[in-house]
From Swiss-Prot:
PROSITE patterns: ACETATE_KINASE_1, ACETATE_KINASE_2. GO terms for biological process: acetate metabolic process; acetyl-CoA biosynthetic process. Its cofactor is Mg(2+); Mn(2+). It is an enzyme of class 2 (transferase). Homodimer. The gene is ackA. Keywords: ATP-binding, Cytoplasm, Kinase, Magnesium, Metal-binding, Nucleotide-binding, Transferase. This is Acetate kinase. It comes from Clostridium botulinum (strain Langeland / NCTC 10281 / Type F). Catalyzes the formation of acetyl phosphate from acetate and ATP. Can also catalyze the reverse reaction. Belongs to the acetokinase family. Its EC number is 2.7.2.1.
């Protein structure tokens, strides 16, 4: 059984064709600059690149070219489109309606439209991608897999903001959380590595990329997470501010005479480690600058590591203890220095790190010592595989 996994952005599209017998990706691809000049599709099969450069006025044209690349006689991996058993779509926001992945039909599409106000940047391109696939592959079943779904198990006291209750009732203002597919995947892999049932362990998962969030997993369910109503909340990130005093936004508007759009740009695109360091939102650049003595770069890293460490401490309280901590995503998988700094100060939990193992980059490994009371893992995330598994399970019903 072969499943196509699609992740649509506003002007880009990522895809993988996964053979579910071996759970291996037969092809991986990226389409960039959809709807703008210089559109390009890059597909990788067994390390070989295949590139298509031609105008793509919209996502439908992009998906046409994806399908063309997959069946290409020389560079493709399937002989006919009928070999694609189903398509799994990443959808950022499922609101309160979806606590798990779902087979797409007209009713689901309407619900996704209703969620646009909750994710105005992300859901529209997700919807456009689904519609394009449905047009081009009308007989192929499609499944929506939501970033928010895993966190729908949060207890009400964890997701409710202390605002007038009507704002929740009438406008859906509450904590939703994101990166759910990643947190779900790495927590399940951690349980396999520990040879324990996920229901019997308490895990804190740290998805640390340009966007970053933590999740507390108890009995296999998300019970707390750091992102909120939007992916802006929680930790300091690459360009996002994370949790700050909300009155700062009023100060920016009233005293500094900034418009709501200007404030939005500052807190989403000019803050985080970029804002503090003035160097970059790329942690490799900031680490390099800090090593060369740039004080603001070092401060940016210190603030970042502190917010992650602080949140791990809080989630240990939420879980009443912790059995495993997992690092994943770009920084979590590749920066030994960041992992070390984050865990420095959590010795009271009985965490002991093996310095040699911690030097490993981007591979699945336990980095704690044998006598560490808390297991610490680095687990490369695989959201595409998780989407494919859900798609297989739902279309088999």
């Amino acid at each position: 059984m072969k499943i196509l996994v699609v992740n649509c952005g506003s002007s880009s599209l990522k895809y993988q064709l996964i053979d579910m017998t071996s759970e291996e990706a037969l092809a991986k691809g990226l389409v960039e600059r959809i709807g703008i000049e210089g559109s390009i599709l890059t597909q990788k099969v067994n390390g070989e690149k295949y590139i298509i450069e031609e105008p793509m006025k919209d996502h439908k044209k992009a998906i046409e070219l994806v399908l063309q690349a997959l069946v290409d006689k020389e560079h493709g991996v399937i002989s006919d489109m009928s070999e694609i058993a189903a398509v799994g779509h990443r959808v950022v926001h499922g609101g309160e309606k979806y606590a798990s992945s779902v087979l797409i039909n007209d009713e689901v599409m309407k619900a996704l439209e209703d969620c646009v106000k909750l994710a105005p940047l992300h859901n529209p391109p997700n919807i456009i991608g689904i519609n394009a696939c449905r047009e081009l592959m009308p007989k192929t079943p499609m499944v929506a897999v939501f970033d928010t779904a895993f966190h729908q198990t949060l207890p009400d006291y964890a997701y409710m903001y202390p605002l007038p209750y009507e704002l929740y009732e009438q406008n859906g203002i509450r904590k939703y959380g994101f990166h759910g597919t990643s947190h779900r995947y790495v927590s399940s892999v951690a349980s396999e590595m520990m040879e324990k049932d996920l229901k019997d362990i308490k895990v804190i998962t740290c998805h640390l990329g340009n966007g970053a969030s933590l999740c507390a997993v108890k009995e296999g369910k998300s019970v707390e997470t750091s992102m909120g109503f939007t992916p802006l909340a929680g930790l300091a990130m690459g360009t996002r501010c994370g949790d700050i005093d909300p009155a700062i936004l009023l100060f920016m508007e009233r005293e500094l005479k900034m418009s709501p759009d200007e404030v939005d740009t500052v807190i989403n695109k000019k803050s985080g480690v970029l804002g503090i360091s003035g160097v970059s939102s790329d942690f490799r650049d900031i680490e390099g600058a800090a090593e060369e003595g740039n004080k603001r770069a070092k401060l940016a890293l210190d603030v970042y590591h502190y917010t992650v460490r602080q949140t791990i401490g809080a989630y240990t309280a939420v879980l009443n203890g912790v059995d495993a901590i997992v690092f994943t995503a770009g920084l979590g998988e590749n920066s030994a220095a960041s992992r070390e700094e984050i865990l420095n100060g959590l010795e009271y939990l009985g965490i002991k790190i093996d310095a040699e193992k911690n030097k490993q980059r981007g591979k699945q490994i336990e980095i704690s010592t044998e006598d560490s009371k808390v297991k610490v893992f680095v687990i490369p995330t695989d959201e595409e595989l998780m989407i494919a598994r859900d798609t297989k399970e739902i279309t088999a019903k």
